[in-house]
Amino acid sequence: MKLSLLSTFAAVIIGALALPQGPGGGGSVTCPGGQSTSNSQCCVWFDVLDDLQTNFYQGSKCESPVRKILRIVFHDAIGFSPALTAAGQFGGGGADGSIIAHSNIELAFPANGGLTDTVEALRAVGINHGVSFGDLIQFATAVGMSNCPGSPRLEFLTGRSNSSQPSPPSLIPGPGNTVTAILDRMGDAGFSPDEVVDLLAAHSLASQEGLNSAIFRSPLDSTPQVFDTQFYIETLLKGTTQPGPSLGFAEELSPFPGEFRMRSDALLARDSRTACRWQSMTSSNEVMGQRYRAAMAKMSVLGFDRNALTDCSDVIPSAVSNNAAPVIPGGLTVDDIEVSCPSEPFPEIATASGPLPSLAPAP
């Protein structure tokens, strides 16, 4: 059940603009636990919310489980290829939870290394509450991001079937891919180059574990527990430092000690097809959040008809606001930015005081 690209885009924009009220604050149905919501089908998600925040997120923390779910939500949904379908092959079910349902197959994909414990923990939550794995992945992502200051409240739609097939292999773009390979793969799934850049806002909260084990959990920007534009700014800084004893897989020099730079991020930040969109994400946390929310809403319904799903966004908590302005890190200036957008000047961004940062591993 697939919508046309035009109708999908229109629906996503409408959904992105219709911001929900807050957890249990936007509807006329009273759940058994006393919460208020827009639809009785949403009531079960309050129980899942409590379970996730207490156990999975270890007290509503913005730490490693959030980073793992951000990998899982992308790796699950991007297993979707209309090109394979057109060639008469199974093209994947999109955001169907197959990474959990068929973990014996999908966790063997190289891109899914290090996700086994998280996938199995999610499986237990889904079974305990009787919810589909596809719905659970989307819900856990929205809840996890709500624990990180500055994050937008993501849309959450429920009603995905728990029936799925294993994703075809080799559909997950990786840090060692070329820009062309990444854009082609994402384009096959329906995403423009601009939307690829928008989705990479998730790297604002990211760290790496398997690309260079010597610097385990090294963050991709200086604020890995805050959803902000520092990732886009810092990826444009000149690479001058090797943060570990040697460079890892798909690793580039970084701007200061402790920060990990993925080759794919560095290339996308400087490629003519994506550089201007990248630069436009550096100066406004609000714009970044709006664009990420819209792109995630689109990704969350890959393989599904959003009109057949139920909007339970009002169950999702709101993140604490982030009022900090974007900055060029201390010890550096705008001259250290590798400006790559020829059509627009680099935005005016203040420089932080103090010395060059040295980052600790992300929690």
UniProtKB/Swiss-Prot annotation:
EC number: 1.11.1.7
Entry-listed glycosylation sites: 162, 358
Superkingdom of the organism of origin: Eukaryota
Cross-referenced InterPro entries: Ccp1-like, Haem_peroxidase, Haem_peroxidase_sf, Ligninase, Ligninase_C, Peroxidases_AS, Peroxidases_heam-ligand_BS
CC per GO annotation: extracellular region
Species: Coprinopsis cinerea
BP GO annotations: cellular response to oxidative stress; hydrogen peroxide catabolic process; response to reactive oxygen species
Enzyme class, first EC level, given as a word: oxidoreductase
Site-annotated residues for Transition state stabilizer: 71
Protein name: Peroxidase
Keyword Signal among record annotations: yes
Annotated signal peptide: 1-20
Cofactor(s), by name: Ca(2+); heme b
Paired cysteines (S-S): 31-43, 42-312, 62-148, 276-341
SUPFAM superfamilies: Heme-dependent peroxidases
